[in-house]
Amino acid sequence: MSRFIRASQRRTLLATLIAATLAQPLLAAESLDSKPASAITAAKNAEVLKNLPFADREEFEAAKRGLIAPFSGQIKNAEGQVVWDMGAYQFLNDKDAADTVNPSLWHQAQLNNIAGLFEVMPKLYQVRGLDPANMTIIEGDSGLVLIDTLTTAETARAALDLYFQHRPKKPIVAVVYSHSHIDHFGGARGIIDEADVKAGKVKVFAPSGFMEHAVSENILAGTAMARRGQYQSGVMVPRGAQAQVDSGLFKTTATNATNTLVAPNVLIEKPYERHTVDGVELEFQLTLGSEAPSDMNIYLPQFKVLNTADNAPPAMHNLLTPRGAEVRDAKAWAGYIDASLEKYGDRTDVLIQQHNWPVWGGDKVRTYLADQRDMYAFLNNRALNLMNKGLTLHEIAAEVSKLPGELDRKWYLRSYYGALSTNLRAVYQRYLGFYDGNPANLDPFPPVEAGKRYVEAMGGADAVLKQMRAAIDKGDYRWAVQLGNHLVFADPANKDARALQADAMEQLGYQTENALWRNMYMTGAMELRHGVPTYDSRGKSEMGRALTPDMFFDLLAIRLDTDKAVGHDMTLNWVFEDLKQDIALTLRNGVLTQRVGSLNPKADVTVKLTKPTLDQIAARKLDLPTAIKQGTVKLDGDGKKLGEFFGLLDSFSPKFNIVEPLE
C-alpha cells in the first residue's frame, strides 16, 4: 500500500472526528482543542530569556528609523475580501512574550510588526509590512525607479498608494526584479502596464535566467509547493499567541489576491553592470545560485546604499526551504556576500534589503556582512567536515547545536527563517543526496506500510498510545510525534492518536525559535484535529500568461496520466502563427516529449493558433470546441486525437493530505 486510504475510511474518519468534538475529555478520548503551554514548555521558554541579550533594543531602533506613515490595517481585493491584515498581529505589541511563544521568536515577530512607509534618506524610500517583501522606491529626475513589485497586484497597489499619500505622484520609469521568487515580482501588473514595457517606456531589469526560473519554480512544481507553502507560512492557521505569530522574514503570505508577471526587457548578464535610469545610478552584482537561482544585489552609488535583496536578511536563511525548491549552495552564497563586502563595504553607509529593516552605519554594515558570510561558510564547511568523518545527515544535525563564537549571540543570525539543523541537512543533501549510505535505509517502506508494521511490533495501537502519553508527560514531544505519525498513518481514524500527536506538535511549535517550524507544527496540529480546510484562499494567478509554448507543453507532460496514456501513442504538431514557432509533440509509451522548431510530417493532427489564444484556453476563458468553431484554432488531420490527448491529463488540487494518508 501507499499513503492512500479509501474514501470509505475517510468518511469514517470524519464521523469519528465530529463525534469526538462532543465527547468529554476523558483519557480514552483525547480533546481536540488547542492546549496551553505545558509546565515543561513554559519553563523551557523562560530559560531563553536568560540566554539572549533582550536588553539590546538596537534592532527596534533600526526598524523604526525613518518611519513616515505606520500601517496596521487591512488590504482588500476588488470583491472586498481581505488580502493582508496587519491588524491581526497587534496582540504582539508592547507585551512580554506569552509562554506559548519562544521569547526570541516573539522578539522577531514584534520587529516584523513595524510596518508602513519609511524614508531611508531623501529620495530613497521603502514600504515595509504590506506584503511579505519590501518595495524600495527611488525618486529619479522625473519618475520613480522601483525595486521589487511585491507578491500580488493588490498589495503592490496599496504600497504605492501609501507612498503617494506622502510623496509627489510621479510615473514609474523602471522596475528592478531583484530575483526570481514570486514575492518580488508577483505584483507587477498591478502597478505597471505591460504594453509600456513592451514599448520600452518602462524598463524592467532582471538577473540572467529570470523568466526560466520564475516560471519553472511557480508552475512546474507549483501545486506541491503551494500546499507545502501553506504549512511553511501558517496561512491557514488563526493569528494569536497559541497559533501563528510570524514567518521570520515577514508576517505571512497574502490571500485572495492576484499573482502576475510582466517579462523583463533588460537582462543583467555580466557579473557587474552599471545602468543609469532617469538620473538614478544602478550597479548590479549578479549572485546567481545564492538565495535564488536568478538573483542579484543592487548598489546605489549616489546614496552609498547597498541593497542585498534576500541574500543577507536579519535571520538565518534557508539553504533548502521547507516549501521545497532546489537546494542552495552555502559556499557560493558566502562567496557572494564576501564579494559585496570587498567591493562595496567601504562605500556603503546603509544596507537595505527586500525583507525587514536596514542596517545603519558603515562600520555596522561591514560587521554585519562579515558575520553573514561567516555563518553560511560555517554551514558548508562544518557539514562537510562531519560528513567526511562518517556522520549522516541526521547525525550532523544533532551534533551541531549552535553557531560558533560570537555568531550565536547575534540577533540577525538567529534561526527565525532557516534553521541550523535543516540547513546542515541541506548541505549534506547537496553533496551526497538523501541516501545516508546505510543499506538498511536504501529502500524503506512508505509511511502507511511502515506505520502498520511499527504499530504491530509495539504491541498494537493501545501500546503505542500508552507510549505517546508517557512521552508527553516527560516533555519528550519529538518522540511522541514520531510515534503518533506511525499510528496515524496505520490508522487515520484513531481519534486518540490524532489528538495526542496534535498536542505534541503544538508544544513543539510553542517551544521553537524558528517561525516556519512553528507554522508547520501549528498547521499539522490543526489538520490532525480538524482535517484539511475546505475553503480556498489562493486568489488568482496570471502566471500562465508568462509561459512560453515549450514551457506550457512541459507542464502538460507533467500533467499526463501515464497509466491512462499507455496505448494512446500519437503525434501532434503545434504551429504558433504569431510567434513563427513550430513544436512537435510525441506521445509514446505513456510519455510526452517535444521538439521545438520541428514539425512531424506524419503527425496525427496539426494545430494552428496564436499564443494569446493558447493563454485563453489555458486560463479556461475559452474552450477548445468554441475556439475551433470561431476559427481561432485551426485543425489539419484527425481532430479527435486532440480531444483524446486532453482526456489523458490529470488535474492537481493543493488540498492533499500531509499529516495523514492521501485519500
From Swiss-Prot:
Species in which this protein is naturally found: Pseudomonas sp
Keywords assigned: Hydrolase, Metal-binding, Signal, Zinc
Function: Alkylsulfatase that catalyzes the enantioselective hydrolysis of secondary-alkylsulfates with strict inversion of configuration, leading to the formation of homochiral (S)-configurated alcohols and nonreacted sulfate esters. The substrate spectrum includes a range of linear, branched or cyclic sec-alkylsulfates. Can use sec-alkylsulfate esters bearing aromatic, olefinic and acetylenic moieties. Acts by cleaving the C-O bond, resulting in inversion at the carbon.
GO molecular function terms attached to this record: linear primary-alkylsulfatase activity; metal ion binding; protein dimerization activity
Binding site for Zn(2+) 1: 179, 181, 291, 310
Assembly with partners or alone: Homodimer.
CDD domains xrefs: arylsulfatase_Sdsa1-like_MBL-fold
EC nos: 3.1.6.19
Positions annotated to bind sulfate: 232, 318-323, 328, 417
Temperature effects on activity: Is very stable at 20-30 degrees Celsius.
Effect in UniProt of substituting residue 417 to H: 238-fold decrease in kcat with (R)-2-octyl sulfate as substrate. 13-fold increase in Km for (R)-2-octyl sulfate
Extra facts: Is a very useful inverting alkylsulfatase for the deracemisation of rac-sec-alcohols via enzymatic hydrolysis of their corresponding sulfate esters, which furnishes homochiral products.
Keyword Hydrolase recorded: yes
Protein name in the entry: (R)-specific secondary-alkylsulfatase
Residues at which Zn(2+) 2 binds: 183-184, 310, 355
UniProt family annotation: Belongs to the metallo-beta-lactamase superfamily. Type III sulfatase family.
Reactions catalysed according to its record: an (R)-secondary-alkyl sulfate + H2O = an (S)-secondary-alcohol + sulfate
Keyword Lipid metabolism applies: no
GO BP annotation list: dodecyl sulfate metabolic process
Pfam families for the chain: Alkyl_sulf_C, Alkyl_sulf_dimr, Lactamase_B
Signal peptide: 1-28
